[in-house]
Structure formats: structure tokens, C-alpha cells
């Protein structure tokens, strides 16, 4: 590798916590399931010119492995089992599972293989893409600028929260996948550690090295895959919720609600699930409307909302988090996950709006029909129609 293209990643744990949480569940429950996933740039960025540099980084990723000190640290956490961690010790990224091409200027990436392996590509690969693009586009930007921006926003944050009881305000770093760089994310997290309301990070490598609490449960792909794993499509979301509880009966219990819209989720989230899960995570749609629906649902089921946690993680910044805190803090426990607005917030730097999402499970289509129309993902229109019918969804939202 050239110096300019030095490896972005230095640890297998430089990923989001929920990837390992889901990987263990897949390892135990769905060892032989195969999946395919695709990269999407939601903006108008033409990233195809970076295909060669990204391919080079993907080749370098096969040399990452779980180190002994990392293995020991994971072993001390309460939710990982020895059989999974011993398997993870032997895990290596397989670059043959990833195809990268420049499609008329657009970056085209497809991943396929056993779910237990493919599941780990998404977050580090997105972090690689983000960092490589910013290396080329913004060579003048640096860590000091990111820190200066954060300091300025923390001054505004202090003014915004003056006189406000912040004892129930909890903020997490969710910024791995679209960070400007690994160095920027670490610097930002170290600074936030000085604040009493900062409670952890989704990044396992940072959590280990900085003695932080790792944060995360499951992602859309857990629910998407069950659309083909479950023999009954209409029951697939309940099957996903139940399988998660089998793996994690009394921990990691924050459920993601928007794989097939919040309303469809709540119809499946009956009193048993609502009692056993510790809370819910918002990732699309109007956050106030979502939170009100969640609280009303708990109350309808006879569950005290104060005993549950709502996690907000959709396109948040500090100001939005405070607005939501003011609205909800007296009625429910709250946590806020901020990503891009912390780890890629530098003057004259345009963050990338990039994702990698599941598109197939065992050779058949899966879909994400979230509460934000632009986040809908699926190639197969017939399957989308079947999914809408199975979950009794209203008007059709335009897929992208």
C-alpha cells in the first residue's frame, strides 16, 4: 500500500457493537443462512472513482484478527458465550465475498456469503469508504478542526441546557460508519468522556481502549432476514423478536422499530415482548410522533413508560437531542445516539450519506420499509407488495 492509502482499520473490533451481538445470534441460530447486501449512496456523490482505493483497503482487511487482549476483554462481558468467541478468534474477512466496481461514476458494491461472516463487513467497510473519500477530497481537514467544531457546539449546548435538569440525559457515540477518520472519532469520543452525560460508544474498539460502555443491540438486517427465515411472512417480525430473546433473554433489549414501519411493529409488539424488552429505538420518521406512539402503546398495555427506555438515533445533533429531551424526559427514560454530526463535523467537509443494506436472504428478496420514504430499500416490487399486504400497510411509499 502507498502511504496515502495506508490501512484505515487496525482492529477487528473497530465496528459497531450490534454487529457482534447479531453475529453471535446468527452463529447460534442461523449458521447456514446465506445473504446478499448492497451499498447505497443516498446522496448525489459519484464515488466510483474511489473503487480501486476501496478495493485495496478490502484486501487489507483480511489480515485483521481478534487479538488476545481483545478476546479476554470480550470474554469478561456478560452476553458473549465461549463457543462464539472461540469461533470469532479464527474469523478472517474474506475479500472474495465483496465485489467493487465503478458503474458510470457510481460506486457499486455487493456482498454475498454466509450471514455469520457477511454480517461483519458493513460497518468497517462504510468507515473505510468514508475515510478514503475524505482523504482524497479534504486533505486539508484535520483532527484539530473537528475538535474546535465540537468545542463550539458544546458551548452552545451548555447555553441551551442552562437551568435544565440534565440528570436523565444520556448521549452515546454512534459515529463509526460515516466518520471522517478513525483518529477524528477517537478524539471526539475522548473529549465527550469529560461530560457527565456521555455514557458510551457503539464502537467496540474504542469502548475497550477507553474503558467505555459498548452500546448497541440489533439492526434492520435482523428483521429483514427473518422475512425469509420465517415460514410465515406476516409472523416474521414476531419471529425476529422472539429469536433475539432466546439469545439474550434479559439484556441487549432495545428493539428497532422501523424495518416495516412503527405502526406495523407495534401491532406485533404485544405485552410479552413489551414487558421483556427494555425499550425501543427510533431510526426514521418524525421522532416526536414516534415517541408519543411508543408511550401510548406502553400505557395501553399497562406498562409504566418510566420503566422503559426510548433511544433516538436518526440524524441527530445536540440541539435536536435537547429538544427531544425537553419533550419526553419527564415521562420515559431516554438515550440519544449521535453519529455523523459528531464524527464528521468539520468546516467545508460534506459527510457521506452511505449505507449497506441486506437485499437477499437464502436467495430470496428482503425489504426495509421504514417510516422515512427515502430509506425504503428493495429491488423486488412483487415482494414489497406481499410485505405490505402481510403487514396491512397503507399507501405505497416510493422506493429508492
From Swiss-Prot:
Transiently phosphorylated on a His residue during the reaction cycle. Phosphorylation strongly increases the affinity for substrates and increases the rate of nicotinate D-ribonucleotide production. Dephosphorylation regenerates the low-affinity form of the enzyme, leading to product release. GO terms for biological process: NAD biosynthetic process via the salvage pathway. The keyword Phosphoprotein applies. It comes from the Bacteria. The lineage of its organism: Bacteria, Pseudomonadati, Pseudomonadota, Gammaproteobacteria, Enterobacterales. Its EC number is 6.3.4.21. Pfam families: NAPRTase, NAPRTase_N. This is Nicotinate phosphoribosyltransferase. It catalyses: nicotinate + 5-phospho-alpha-D-ribose 1-diphosphate + ATP + H2O = nicotinate beta-D-ribonucleotide + ADP + phosphate + diphosphate. Belongs to the NAPRTase family. It is an enzyme of class 6 (ligase). The modification Phosphohistidine is found at residue 220. Keywords: Ligase, Phosphoprotein, Pyridine nucleotide biosynthesis. One of its GO terms (molecular function) is nicotinate phosphoribosyltransferase activity. Pathway: Cofactor biosynthesis; NAD(+) biosynthesis; nicotinate D-ribonucleotide from nicotinate: step 1/1. One of its GO terms (cellular component) is cytosol. Catalyzes the synthesis of beta-nicotinate D-ribonucleotide from nicotinate and 5-phospho-D-ribose 1-phosphate at the expense of ATP. The keyword Ligase applies.
Amino acid at each position: 500500500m502507498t502511504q496515502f492509502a495506508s490501512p484505515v482499520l487496525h482492529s477487528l473490533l473497530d465496528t459497531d457493537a450490534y454487529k457482534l451481538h447479531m453475529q453471535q445470534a446468527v452463529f447460534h441460530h442461523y449458521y447456514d443462512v446465506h445473504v446478499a447486501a448492497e451499498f447505497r449512496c443516498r446522496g448525489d456523490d459519484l464515488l466510483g472513482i474511489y473503487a480501486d482505493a476501496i478495493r485495496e483497503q478490502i484486501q487489507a482487511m483480511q489480515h485483521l484478527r481478534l487479538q488476545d487482549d481483545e478476546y479476554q476483554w470480550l470474554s469478561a462481558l456478560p452476553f458473549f458465550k465461549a463457543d462464539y468467541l472461540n469461533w470469532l478468534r479464527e474469523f478472517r474477512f474474506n475479500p472474495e465475498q465483496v465485489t467493487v466496481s465503478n458503474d458510470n461514476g457510481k460506486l457499486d458494491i455487493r456482498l454475498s456469503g454466509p450471514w455469520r461472516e457477511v454480517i461483519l463487513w458493513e460497518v468497517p467497510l462504510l468507515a473505510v469508504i468514508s475515510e478514503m473519500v475524505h482523504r482524497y477530497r479534504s486533505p486539508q481537514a484535520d483532527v484539530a478542526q473537528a475538535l474546535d467544531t465540537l468545542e463550539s457546539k458544546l458551548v452552545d449546548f451548555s447555553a441551551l441546557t442552562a437551568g435544565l435538569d440534565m440528570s436523565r440525559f444520556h448521549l452515546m457515540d454512534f459515529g463509526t460508519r460515516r466518520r471522517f477518520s478513525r483518529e477524528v472519532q477517537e478524539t471526539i469520543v475522548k473529549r465527550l468522556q469529560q461530560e457527565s452525560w456521555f455514557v458510551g460508544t457503539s464502537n467496540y474498539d474504542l469502548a475497550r481502549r477507553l474503558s467505555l460502555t459498548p452500546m448497541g443491540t440489533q439492526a434492520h438486517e435482523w428483521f429483514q432476514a427473518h422475512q425469509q427465515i420465517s415460514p410465515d411472512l406476516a409472523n416474521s417480525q414476531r419471529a425476529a423478536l422472539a429469536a433475539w430473546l432466546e439469545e439474550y433473554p434479559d439484556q441487549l433489549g432495545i428493539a428497532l422499530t422501523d424495518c416495516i414501519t412503527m405502526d406495523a411493529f407495534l401491532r406485533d409488539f404485544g405485552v410479552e415482548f413489551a414487558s421483556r424488552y427494555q425499550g425501543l429505538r427510533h431510526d426514521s420518521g418524525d421522532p416526536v410522533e414516534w415517541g408519543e406512539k411508543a408511550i401510548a402503546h406502553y400505557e395501553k398495555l399497562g406498562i409504566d413508560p418510566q420503566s422503559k427506555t426510548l433511544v433516538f438515533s436518526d440524524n441527530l445533533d445536540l440541539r435536536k437531542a435537547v429538544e427531544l429531551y425537553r419533550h419526553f424526559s419527564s415521562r420515559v427514560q431516554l438515550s440519544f445516539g449521535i453519529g455523523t454530526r459528531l464524527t464528521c463535523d468539520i468546516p467545508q467537509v460534506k459527510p457521506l450519506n452511505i449505507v449497506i443494506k441486506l437485499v437477499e436472504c437464502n436467495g430470496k428478496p428482503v425489504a426495509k420499509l421504514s417510516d422515512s420514504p427515502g430509506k425504503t430499500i428493495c429491488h423486488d416490487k412483487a415482494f414489497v407488495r406481499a410485505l405490505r399486504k402481510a403487514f396491512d400497510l397503507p399507501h405505497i411509499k416510493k422506493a429508492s
